[in-house]
Structure formats: C-alpha cells, structure tokens
Amino acid sequence: MAPRQSKTAKRSKVQNKTRTVESEVGSDSAARNLLMSQPKLTPKSIVKAPSKAAVKKQQAKIRLYGARSGKEYREDQLDIPALNKAITPGVKAKKGKKGKKFVEDNDALTLNRLVKSINDKYDQANESKLEKSRRLDEIRELKKQELERKEEQKENKLEGKKNEVKSKASLARANRRKSAKSQKNEESKAASNKGKKSVSFA
C-alpha cells in the first residue's frame, strides 16, 4: 500500500503544474469557422507607384532621347574580354560553331558521301529495303575510300619527312667530308713547304 501524502505535498503538486496556452482555433469550432471565412490578406507592396511629376519627366526624356530597348544583356552575351586572366601563349580559343569541317571544292569523294548521307533522312519514307541497303552500302564504300585516302596521305607525309631527314643527314655528311679533305690538303701543303729549301742567288 502506498504511503499517505500530506496536505502541503498535495498543494505543492497542484501549484507547480506547467500552464499550457491552447489556441481557440484548435478547441473552439465557432472560432475555427470565423477564421476560415476571413479573406486572405496580402501584404502591401513595397514598390511605390511613380508620382505624376516623375511620369511626366520620364515621358519628356523619351520624347527627347527615345525609349530604351527593354532587352537586357548578360555579361557572357556581350563578349567582353575577361581581365586578369592568364593567357596561355600559342593557344588561340576557337570561336564560332564547333565541329565545323570545311570540304575542298575538288574533293568529289567527300561531297558524294555527304550528299548520300544527307538524303538518308528524306528518302527513307518512300524507298524499299533493297534500295536502302544499296545506298547504305554505297555510303560505307565511300567512307572506306576516304579512310584509305587519309591513310595514304599520312604515309606520304611520313615518307616525305623521312626523305627530308635523310637528305639533310647526307648533306651534312658530304659537308663534313669536304671540310676534312680540305683540311688534309692544307696540312700536306704546309708539310711540303717546310721540307723544301729555297736558295736565292745574288
């Protein structure tokens, strides 16, 4: 059995209760209904409407200098050069459309390939499977020829460089031989001049 509490203990227990503030909206249904019927009050706008004098002044300016264009440009659209930026020497930033490839006028192979591949989008609606496969084969063949030509150009360039290096080396070798020969001749002349005795008659 629990021990009996004294009157003072009971009183202190009741007095030390924490008070809670409960809103009427939660407890009172009438208050809740009143709140729901209230219109939504929007805060006053901070932007003031211009005065008549200010409007007149603005219109006078427009008449004098013309209206400003409403379009506002960002910094990246204005193409302003960036300051305090480290510029790497010898590297030029590419401008314009990326992936632009120019074809030479006399390059019939590439032109044919491009024409055939461009028509691919528009011709597929009214062509049979056989025609399509034939055309795709043609495009593949043209691409293969282009690759072969590129490889050939690479090989030719490499061969040209090799020949250039070889010719430079042979030229240097020939120069070295010439200089060595001329040096030997000079030495032999000097030695023969030393061995001869000159006699002068008075």
Swiss-Prot record:
Region Disordered, residue ranges: 1-43, 145-202
The UniProt entry's coiled-coil ranges are 111-176
Identify a single GO molecular function assigned to this protein: mRNA binding
Principal subcellular localisation of the protein: nucleus
Specify the superkingdom.
Eukaryota
Give me the Gene Ontology terms describing cellular component: nucleolus; preribosome, large subunit precursor
User: GO BP, one example?
Assistant: intracellular mRNA localization
Q: Where is the composition biased (Basic and acidic residues)?
A: 145-167
Regions of biased composition (Basic residues) lie at: 7-16
Described purpose of this protein according to its UniProt entry: Required for efficient assembly and nuclear export of the 60S ribosomal subunit.
* Subunit-level organization: Component of the 66S pre-ribosomal particle.
Name of the molecule in the record:
60S ribosomal subunit assembly/export protein LOC1
Species assigned in the record: Debaryomyces hansenii (strain ATCC 36239 / CBS 767 / BCRC 21394 / JCM 1990 / NBRC 0083 / IGC 2968)
Q: What is the lineage of its organism?
A: Eukaryota, Fungi, Dikarya, Ascomycota, Saccharomycotina
Q: Which gene encodes it?
A: LOC1
